[in-house]
């Protein structure tokens, strides 16, 4: 049967996708619902902690029971999105306000960016990347806070 995959090919493809973190095993509905509130509370704590520099860089999925590794800026973008901000420019502005409140700035090529315009430009670029790449994973894994 040309064009059909056998079990070994399917298993190999799934193994590869899982190894690349492009696929995840999911829990049954009862387990997902049981874990949802605890995951939400943990994720809220992590995103709040990221405001102050945080030490935990993972959000937990109730769907898979697994963690999604994220840097501080991505955690702050996720927090802004999960709080209802829908546009990358809003996330960038939100993160910039947080960084400013701590006297921090973005780094680019190992150098601190000077001024609001340069920092917002970099944050907007990163927010667009987050929207194109990471946000899909957050939604698919039902990560919320």
What does each model-found stretch correspond to?
Residues 1-145:
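Long, charge-rich, low-complexity alpha-helical segments
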